[in-house]
Amino acid sequence: MTHQTHSYHMVNPSPWPLTGALSALLMTSGLIMWFHFNSMILLTLGLSTNILTMYQWWRDIIRESTFQGHHTPTVQKGLRYGMILFIVSEVLFFTGFFWAFYHSSLAPTPELGGCWPPTGIHPLNPLEVPLLNTSVLLASGVSITWAHHSLMEGNRKHMLQALFITIALGLYFTLLQASEYYEAPFTISDGIYGSTFFVATGFHGLHVIIGSTFLIVCFLRQVKFHFTSNHHFGFERAAWYWHFVDVVWLFLYVSIYWWGS
């Protein structure tokens, strides 16, 4: 900030957008190779380069914000707008899945037996594992709010405790979801019901894994004293994202598990 007369962050040239794009190409190509030729080499390479890119990009952002002071209030305002727009785009992303589900379930075709769930499909009981999953995510929403309030009050110990609980609940949710998939009496290839169920809940599960990773990074940063009560936008973004994941799950539970069964 020494040689500039404005509060904006002029980012230095970075290779990470390019390596991120290339890793995305490798992952999508790798998925096709896995599906059609049962080879995971390209997918593994894509995932590895993606993880390395994320690590190094996050490292640079942490350096610029925490140690170099480039994230001024003006920059933080822009980042807030960016995160809001990102969450709006995610809402529209999931809207497509809900649209596909309701389009198929509200007027089932004769090929489905004229009913929903389609003939031959035995849906999961919404009062068993799905209800437990709902309780787990709602509890994690409470604990991350506790973490946020503790951070605002400067209570580092409680913030770390609450954040650890949130991460543990997120990982528990992922474990429950994996066991549910393993025991489900239908698969993704079982017509429109199987495809809408697994794609919608699967992408939500992916978002839970991403959110848990985001929170783990925040936990490690808080251990190293990176956040203060006035400067903690990285954690704030993670909390927003986690609440979004909570709300999407409530819609999934009511629509697909409860009403759809």
UniProtKB/Swiss-Prot annotation:
Catalyzed reactions per annotation: 4 Fe(II)-[cytochrome c] + O2 + 8 H(+)(in) = 4 Fe(III)-[cytochrome c] + 2 H2O + 4 H(+)(out)
Side Mitochondrial matrix, residues: 1-15, 67-72, 153-155, 224-232
Keyword Ribonucleoprotein: no
GO molecular function: cytochrome-c oxidase activity
Single biological process term from Gene Ontology: respiratory chain complex IV assembly
EC number: 7.1.1.9
Membrane topology field: Multi-pass membrane protein
Broad enzyme group: translocase
Predominant place of localization: mitochondrion
InterPro entries in the record: Cyt_c/ubiquinol_Oxase_su3, Cyt_c_oxase_su3_dom, Cyt_c_oxidase-like_su3, Cyt_c_oxidase_su3-like_sf, Cyt_c_oxidase_su3_a-hlx
Compartments in which it is found: Mitochondrion inner membrane
Keywords assigned: Membrane, Mitochondrion, Mitochondrion inner membrane, Translocase, Transmembrane, Transmembrane helix
Signal peptide: none
Segments passing through the bilayer: 16-34, 41-66, 73-105, 129-152, 156-183, 191-223, 233-256
CDD domains found in the cross-reference section: Cyt_c_Oxidase_III (cd01665)
Any Gene Ontology CC annotation: respiratory chain complex IV
Mitochondrial intermembrane topology ranges: 35-40, 106-128, 184-190, 257-261
Family according to the record: Belongs to the cytochrome c oxidase subunit 3 family.
PANTHER family for the chain: CYTOCHROME C OXIDASE SUBUNIT 3, CYTOCHROME C OXIDASE SUBUNIT III
Record's subunit section: Component of the cytochrome c oxidase (complex IV, CIV), a multisubunit enzyme composed of 14 subunits. The complex is composed of a catalytic core of 3 subunits MT-CO1, MT-CO2 and MT-CO3, encoded in the mitochondrial DNA, and 11 supernumerary subunits COX4I, COX5A, COX5B, COX6A, COX6B, COX6C, COX7A, COX7B, COX7C, COX8 and NDUFA4, which are encoded in the nuclear genome.
Function: Component of the cytochrome c oxidase, the last enzyme in the mitochondrial electron transport chain which drives oxidative phosphorylation. The respiratory chain contains 3 multisubunit complexes succinate dehydrogenase (complex II, CII), ubiquinol-cytochrome c oxidoreductase (cytochrome b-c1 complex, complex III, CIII) and cytochrome c oxidase (complex IV, CIV), that cooperate to transfer electrons derived from NADH and succinate to molecular oxygen, creating an electrochemical gradient over the inner membrane that drives transmembrane transport and the ATP synthase.
Name of the protein in its database record: Cytochrome c oxidase subunit 3
